[in-house]
Curated annotation (Swiss-Prot):
Lineage: Bacteria, Pseudomonadati, Pseudomonadota, Gammaproteobacteria, Enterobacterales
Knockout mutant characteristics: Deletion of the gene impacts ubiquinone biosynthesis in aerobic conditions but does not decrease menaquinone biosynthesis. Mutant accumulates octaprenylphenol, an early intermediate of the ubiquinone biosynthetic pathway.
Predominant subcellular localization, coarse grouping: cytoplasm
Family: Belongs to the UbiK family.
Name of the protein in question: Ubiquinone biosynthesis accessory factor UbiK
Length: 96
């Protein structure tokens, strides 16, 4: 889901931005920050970049198929309209 290295980087940046007195708590504070970040990020409904890219491709293929189906329906509707316009041979008067 989320790269643990990114979480560590964010935790380290937050830790480094703290005043010196607080920073002296050392790794304990960094661990707590990392745990809190991880807990908060897992609550978010996030997807990985790979999952996002896969779903983007699926959506593109679906749109292409939809466009083809719409075109096919239009062609069939036009053909149906043309057939309806042609006179019915059974209702025509007999020719001699």
């Amino acid at each position: 889901m989320i790269d643990p290295k990114k979480i560590e980087q964010i935790a380290r940046q937050v830790h480094e931005s703290m005043p010196k007195g607080i920073r002296e708590f050392g790794e304990d504070v960094e661990k707590k920050i990392r745990q809190t970040l991880q807990a908060q990020l897992t609550r978010l409904d996030l997807v990985s970049r790979e999952e996002f890219d896969v779903q983007t491709q699926v959506l593109l293929r679906t749109r292409e198929k939809l466009a083809l189906l719409e075109q096919r329906i239009s062609e069939l509707e036009n053909r149906s309209t043309e057939i309806k316009k042609q006179p019915d041979p059974e209702t025509l008067p007999p020719t001699l």
